Amino acid sequence: MRTSQYLLSTLKETPSDAVVISHQLMLRAGMIRKLASGLYTWLPLGLRALRKAEAIVREEMDKAGALEVLMPAIQPAELWQESGRWEQYGPELLRIRDRHAREFCVGPTHEEVITDLARNELNSYKQLPINFYQIQTKFRDEIRPRFGLMRGREFLMKDAYSFHLTQESLQETYDRMHQAYCNIFSRLGLEFRPVQADTGSIGGTGSHEFHVLAASGEDDIAFSDSSDYAANIEKAEAIPREKARAAASEELRLVDTPDARTIDELVRQFGLPVEKTIKTLVVQGAEEGRLVALIVRGDHELNEIKAANLEQVASPLAFASEAEIRAAIGAGPGSLGPLNLPIPAIVDRSVTLLSDFAAGANLDGKHYFGLNWERDLPLPQVADLRNVVEGDPSPDGQGSLVIKRGIEVGHIFQLGTKYSEAMNCKVLGENGKPVTLIMGCYGIGVSRVVAAAIEQNYDERGILWPQALAPFQIALVPMKYESAAVREATDRLYAELVAAGYEVLLDDRDKKTSPGVKFADMELIGIPHRIVVSERGLAEGTLEYKGRRETEVQAIPAADLITFLGNRIGR
């Protein structure tokens, strides 16, 4: 491809509304253009990268035995009402009416549509297991679209759905999809982690997210430094570092703390180690009108997902108001603790290993110092309540946890019978009786993968594409293309490279575009390999080569270039 026949729309300045690096670089490199909030047009350069990601996803899905279909983007309300999600999904679901006043939605996901397809097309156990997938544009009416393609309203997604007679069959397909996803992200050249995850609004039982590691990620993920263990921070089990509780060495005393309403104030004013303090959070109980206290160490954070999953706690999690707390306990937030607490309490594991700790006295402006379990008060119910922190023991017993930011690019679920039961999706089993199908679903944000790759691969000059995603493999830049000798050599080399199967962008812009601008554009776009043709090089029988990730320029004998590139690019 020649730039004279291409849309090369690079920008020198970064648009003011672009916050994350992928958004900035995709706009500056001329890959996308904003149409409206959360809506983007893919320009030719960006579309090449997107199609490469899509092709790898399709190849691995086909290899894993999934069957490609294409479902409508517009879905009838009746299907969503049948599953119960029409009311549950919320304002992210864009609802529309046709001219006959029939209700539809623009699909953010396709569980209902595929379940309807399955119940109409599948009738016998002999057709199972089966796994359908599509690569299609989705729409979610995000309240605050931001970060370009990272959180847009319209996006390209690969979603797959499998149907099974047994949990064992589902597990086999789930494992196959897990491996297919690992293959996809490995082929894309990304540093990623599959992590145990909460199932969220999709529902179901088992769940894994796939995260590309990047500082701009919205999720915290925890993984072992010595094994394959990894989990979303919402899901990661918090194992205390301490093995046993130290013996008590202080007397219990009641201390006036009128100006210490927070852990930070208590620690600062009294010189306490923060790990020797606890905080008591009061939430609504599962039983109406009942409050429950959740107690974690002062330097730890309550994990709201874990808390909401407790049998005694209302879900979704709801914190009690100050008025409710005062009515039940007689003191306000900031002065609460486990001693003489008149409501049920659940403490985190780490709290049970404390000795000589400080806690609110359930009297405004007062705390107990030197508290000790079993001497001063019995241990209440114990549960895993907190977020893990870096350095915690890995739950699999191997090494310590590292916490990094991640961008979620894939998610797989074991749905169970949530949708098939609601929508009466059954087949005849071996005994001739109807059997409700067990489902799995498997999603990849294809357009988000492209943005995530940039978040992980860039420098001060532009994008550093992984080889598999680069829009072009080679940038061919002639110096003085108006020179007959340079033009002839460049055109001949371009033809040879294309004939050898390489994707080449020939920068044939005229002399009004300086070599420096050409080099800067090719680096901004992120083409992995650059070849320069010059009069001096031709006189010496050499071509100038520079890898995008390298600082040094090499002089390559012109006769050896194809072999050289074959070794570098892997042909």
Curated annotation (Swiss-Prot):
Annotated keywords: Aminoacyl-tRNA synthetase, ATP-binding, Cytoplasm, Ligase, Nucleotide-binding, Protein biosynthesis
Gene Ontology BP annotations: prolyl-tRNA aminoacylation
Enzyme Commission numbers on file: 6.1.1.15
Catalyses which reaction(s): tRNA(Pro) + L-proline + ATP = L-prolyl-tRNA(Pro) + AMP + diphosphate
Pfam families: HGTP_anticodon, tRNA-synt_2b, tRNA_edit
Subcellular location, principal: cytoplasm
PROSITE patterns for this protein: AA_TRNA_LIGASE_II
Recorded GO MF terms: aminoacyl-tRNA deacylase activity; ATP binding; proline-tRNA ligase activity
Keyword Amino-acid biosynthesis appears in the UniProt entry: no
UniProt subcellular location: Cytoplasm
Cellular component terms (Gene Ontology): cytosol
Domain characteristics, as noted in the entry: Consists of three domains: the N-terminal catalytic domain, the editing domain and the C-terminal anticodon-binding domain.
Family: Belongs to the class-II aminoacyl-tRNA synthetase family. ProS type 1 subfamily.
Its job: Catalyzes the attachment of proline to tRNA(Pro) in a two-step reaction: proline is first activated by ATP to form Pro-AMP and then transferred to the acceptor end of tRNA(Pro). As ProRS can inadvertently accommodate and process non-cognate amino acids such as alanine and cysteine, to avoid such errors it has two additional distinct editing activities against alanine. One activity is designated as 'pretransfer' editing and involves the tRNA(Pro)-independent hydrolysis of activated Ala-AMP.
Subunit structure: Homodimer.
Name of this protein: Proline--tRNA ligase
